[in-house]
């Protein structure tokens, strides 16, 4: 898998390897039957869990770790980190390996008792603080303010505006802290081509059609201008924003290789698969 990762430092590769192996053991220990009973879409994840939960997502974590260690906090001074809605603590595990004090927040009850207990035990064993809270509806009063707040690939799953959530995260970010936000780019190159050809840029319709309500897949992905609007509405000031490709398997096929070769020739901006924004609290 290393040859499909984004380029980064040896330090980041090392902690990603450690975190990936720890999460592999955690995944192997979890009984997914309760999740599958609640939502049949989890069956494909259970059947190939390491691929879907780690290998498919690893570049998102590499990207964030690389930014933190080389640009945002190279001297390791912003030591308190909180990840909101992380589900499986892959990135938090890697951050603890780098010496950060990491808190994770998610409503693990939604994934079933077996999953919740497994993750709580894992956190106890790996120096992670965990709060089992609904990030939309529960109070964050018990959470300490953090130097770095993180929200990756979460808001696209919401069935409404993310403004309330981002406001809550802003209130738990120190005045001199930073917020790292990531969301799929609805206007990426492949999705623009799909739309031109008459195909939907959204999730497979059969998955959506046969899923229980509310749908737990991607309800609303975003554009770069929409991310800017969201950050401004939540009193964050964007310091850096970019799009990037995170799927390590998208260039394995000949079609994927062709698209990768073609994209640099397109005279348009913001064609990457994901949008990453780094923001500060507005003074």
Please tell me what each predicted stretch does.
Residues 67, 95, 176, 282-283:
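Short alpha-helical scaffold segments that flank and stabilize functional sites
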């Amino acid at each position: 898998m290393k040859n499909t990762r984004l380029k980064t430092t040896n330090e980041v590769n090392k902690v990603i390897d450690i975190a990936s192996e720890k999460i592999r053991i955690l995944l192997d220990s979890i009984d997914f039957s309760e999740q599958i009973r609640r939502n049949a879409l989890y069956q494909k994840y259970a059947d190939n869990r390491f691929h879907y939960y780690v290998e498919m997502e690893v570049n998102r974590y590499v990207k964030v770790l690389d930014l933190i260690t080389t640009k945002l906090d190279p001297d390791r001074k912003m030591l308190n980190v909180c990840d909101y809605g992380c589900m499986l603590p892959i990135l938090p595990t890697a951050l603890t390996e780098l010496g950060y004090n990491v808190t994770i927040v998610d409503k693990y009850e939604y994934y079933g008792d077996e999953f919740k207990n497994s993750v709580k035990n894992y956190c106890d064993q790996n120096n992670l603080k965990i709060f089992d809270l609904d990030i939309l509806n529960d109070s964050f009063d018990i959470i300490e303010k953090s130097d770095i707040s993180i929200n990756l690939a979460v808001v696209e799953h919401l069935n409404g505006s993310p403004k309330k959530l981002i406001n809550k995260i802003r209130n738990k970010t120190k005045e001199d802290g930073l917020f790292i936000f990531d969301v799929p780019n609805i206007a990426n190159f492949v999705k623009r081509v799909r739309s031109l050809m008459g195909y939907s840029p959204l999730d497979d319709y059969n998955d959506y059609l046969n899923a229980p309500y509310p749908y737990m897949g991607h309800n609303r992905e975003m554009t770069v201008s929409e991310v800017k609007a969201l950050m401004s509405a939540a009193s964050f000031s964007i310091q850096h924003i970019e799009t990037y490709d995170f799927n390590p398997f998208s260039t394995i096929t000949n079609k994927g290789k062709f698209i990768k070769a073609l994209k640099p020739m397109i005279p348009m901006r913001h064609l990457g698969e994901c949008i990453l924004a780094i923001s500060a609290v507005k003074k």
